[in-house]
């Protein structure tokens, strides 16, 4: 079975390498370009629509590998492919015509509804040290909310060359590893093919980028990752609920901090700003490439935690969760991603240390 995964991965990688230059020329020809402005980091007009190359490589390679596959679930596959096609079309139209947020949201909800209609749902949740809970009819809105939320979270971090693609590749690789451990052949093949298509595109998208993925890429990757995470972790365990959140830790935490920041500043949650994780790292003077590499490292930390959560005892999993969240909070305070100058956890630790020093004296 392993050769099928490898074949799908290599086919997607080669297709993405071949398709991306063609999509780049097509984007310029149809006027799907991204002009620099106050919020953006790039300083010259860049072609968008890179997501089309990722999508086409994914579809093409998957169709090549699928006939060699055994034990897959066809309804799940076609639900994912149909939903992914919808969001990619919506994203491509936005790359060219700048659709309104309401239209894009409607397209995302439609794609999510298609996946749910094909039977992909979050229908079981387990709480720590408790019994599992069947979600019943709530599984439908919860699944749609999850898919739409992750889709937009990937879109939010797409602010530096190679950032969204690299973080998505790390998340996809993690899903692939965990799906192998759990014996989920359908998710393993889908994630192997998706990983190959992302890496092939990343060759052209890493700094200095020759093409942007655009909304066609961000929406496709976010939708695919959200759906794969639902497919891969439906077991009745504590970590089945937490693992997908950790796999997508970078985009989800950045989105969470953005919501908190805008709430504290009394600005609309949908209002754009330059205080996302990559903006904060740039402000520290790390530079474009180093900022991206640091975020790759954070994504790898979340990925490692996700794998540990799936392989250790429950009490160890709770410790891993607590330590990871503590590191995340301290890091957020150090770079000022929520509010500059406010460091509650760091200040608390400093007060404890000063008290201990005074007691010794």
Task: Put a short name on every predicted segment.
Residues 1-255:
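"…together with the soluble PPM/PP2C metallo-phosphatase catalytic core" -> "…together
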Residues 18, 251-256, 304, 330, ...:
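Hydrophobic transmembrane alpha-helical segments of multi-pass transport and channel proteins
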Residues 21-46, 257-289, 355-359:
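Cytosolic, membrane-interface loops and tails of multi-pass inner-membrane proteins
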Residues 22-26, 331-347:
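Membrane-interface capping segments at transmembrane-helix boundaries
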Residues 58, 197, 284-306:
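Hydrophobic membrane-spanning alpha-helices of multi-pass integral membrane proteins
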Residues 231-237, 323-340:
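N-terminal hydrophobic signal/anchor transmembrane helix of membrane proteins
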Residues 303-322:
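Extracellular/periplasmic helix-loop-helix junctions in multi-pass membrane proteins
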Residues 341-359:
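Short, highly charged, low-complexity non-transmembrane loops/tails of multi-pass membrane proteins
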């Amino acid at each position: 079975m392993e050769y099928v995964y490898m074949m799908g991965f290599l086919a997607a990688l080669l297709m993405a390498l071949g398709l991306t230059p063609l999509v780049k020329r097509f984007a310029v020809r149809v006027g799907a370009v991204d002009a620099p402005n106050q919020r953006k980091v790039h300083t010259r007009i860049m072609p968008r629509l890179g997501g089309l190359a990722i999508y086409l490589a994914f579809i093409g390679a998957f169709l090549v590998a699928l006939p060699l596959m055994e034990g897959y679930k066809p309804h799940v596959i076609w639900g994912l492919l149909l939903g992914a096609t919808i969001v990619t079309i919506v994203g491509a139209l936005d790359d060219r015509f700048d659709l309104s947020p309401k239209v894009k949201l409607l397209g995302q909800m439609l794609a999510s509804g298609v996946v749910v209609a094909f039977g992909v749902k979050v229908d079981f949740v387990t709480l720590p040290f408790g019994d599992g809970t069947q979600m019943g009819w709530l599984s439908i809105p919860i699944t749609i909310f999850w898919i739409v939320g992750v889709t937009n979270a990937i879109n939010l971090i797409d602010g530096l060359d190679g950032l969204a693609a690299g973080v998505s590749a790390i998340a996809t690789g993690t899903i692939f590893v965990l799906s192998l451990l759990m014996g989920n052949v359908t998710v393993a093949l889908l994630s192997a093919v998706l990983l190959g298509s992302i890496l092939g595109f990343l060759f052209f998208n890493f700094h200095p980028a020759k093409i942007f993925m655009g909304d066609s890429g961000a929406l496709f990757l976010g939708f695919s990752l959200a759906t794969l995470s639902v497919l891969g972790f439906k077991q009745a365990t504590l970590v089945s609920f937490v693992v997908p959140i950790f796999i997508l830790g970078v985009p989800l935490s950045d989105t969470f901090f953005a919501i908190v920041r805008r709430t504290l500043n009394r600005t609309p949650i949908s209002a754009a700003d330059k205080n996302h994780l990559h903006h904060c790292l740039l402000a520290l003077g790390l530079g474009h490439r180093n900022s991206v590499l640091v975020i790759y490292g954070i994504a790898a930390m979340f990925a490692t935690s996700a794998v540990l959560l799936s392989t250790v005892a429950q009490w160890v999993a709770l410790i891993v969760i607590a330590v990871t969240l503590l590191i995340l909070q301290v890091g957020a305070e150090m770079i000022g991603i929520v509010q500059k100058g406010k460091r509650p956890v760091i200040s608390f630790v400093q007060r404890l240390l000063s008290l201990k020093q005074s007691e010794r004296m």
